[in-house]
Amino acid sequence: MKQQRVLIWSKSVSDFFDGNVCGIGVQLYFWAQTFTQNRWEVSTLTSHKSFIHENIHFIHYRNWGKLEFFFFFLAILWNIVQLHPQIVIHRGAGRITLPLAIISKCSGVKFVLFSASDTDFETGRELIAGGSHNRRMWHKAIKWLQYIIVQNQYQHDMLKSKYGKESLILNNVWGHVNITRKNNQATDVVWVANFRRLKRAEWFINAAKVMPEYDFTMIGGASKQDHGYYEEIKQQATSIPNLHFLGKKDFNETNSIVANSRLLCCTSTFEGFPNTFLQAWANNIPVISTVNPSSIISKNHLGIVVETEESFKLQIRKLLQDDRLYSSISQCVNHYFSINYEMTVNYNKLVNFVNEKQDS
């Protein structure tokens, strides 16, 4: 039987191995793992020379600078012709989606788009760099799409309402991760995110100030769009004795720190589905969060959902002090995670969705 091929159109997996961790990179890496385990040949992009690592083929893709968009079409066409993939995958909103969708369709290749944020289908709120013309290209791209994977019910409903498009709600996948447990890494409360103002890191800082009896840890790198915010938060954090500002850490280091914590906090104004939740739940750790995708936290007792900064502080203290409540939530996390984030189950859902849509 001829080996099936998938092309992941992103440099995020390569960035992941370089230690530049972001949610898109983590998820695309685990999807690459999933496809290789199911005997697909997996290719993706890199700024480095072409190489193979963990059975993933990394293809050199140069940066064309200001001329890059004009070479998108040629580069996409060239790689599709050379690799003959059955599936092309891309994640997140952006102008590149349009040439990917057009060339894939014209080449008879199934193009699968994974959403990355709740704003992906909110007209005018998409997190797309550049001018309004980039948003218009994204809007046109959606009309070309046949296979769309969303992270939660809100994204599903927005896509249906705004564009009349159906989609599959699919859990993020989570592969095997080696965890190092060290007593000197132990912390009570951890916050993990790239520093952007929409993440509201100041909530976490203010919580640490009023709870000096607990250890707080912040992990994350600066955002290209908001580097000043990183420096602002770092300066505030250094003046708080019980708050450890670690800055950027690689994926394995972050996992070990989360695994040695008691609570994970999310203070974002909006998200798609934070991978940090999975880092916590894989270790039976509850979350306290301002986002609740598809009501997953409240429905399954996986943590506590808050709306205000005052409630955020109160619930941190409550969960750290109430051993019975903590144990109850931790048990629910263990049960829910073990049956909902298995890689093979989600792989089969994806493949069945693509095949059924093709046949319909």
Q: Which residues does each predicted region cover?
A:
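N-terminal subdomain of nucleotide-sugar transferases
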Residues: 1-50, 209
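Short hydrophobic beta-strand element within catalytic cores of glycosyltransferases
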Residues: 282-290
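An aromatic- and histidine-rich active-site surface loop
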Residues: 88-109, 113-115, 119-120
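Conserved donor-binding/catalytic core segment of Leloir-type glycosyltransferases
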Residues: 7-9, 181-199, 205-211, 216-219
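Aromatic "clamp/platform" in nucleotide-sugar-dependent glycosyltransferases that forms part
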Residues: 269
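Membrane-proximal helix-turn-helix segments that form the acceptor-binding/catalytic region
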Residues: 30, 77-78, 102, 106, ...
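Nucleotide-sugar donor phosphate/pyrophosphate-binding loop at the beta->alpha transition
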Residues: 71, 110, 120-140, 144, ...
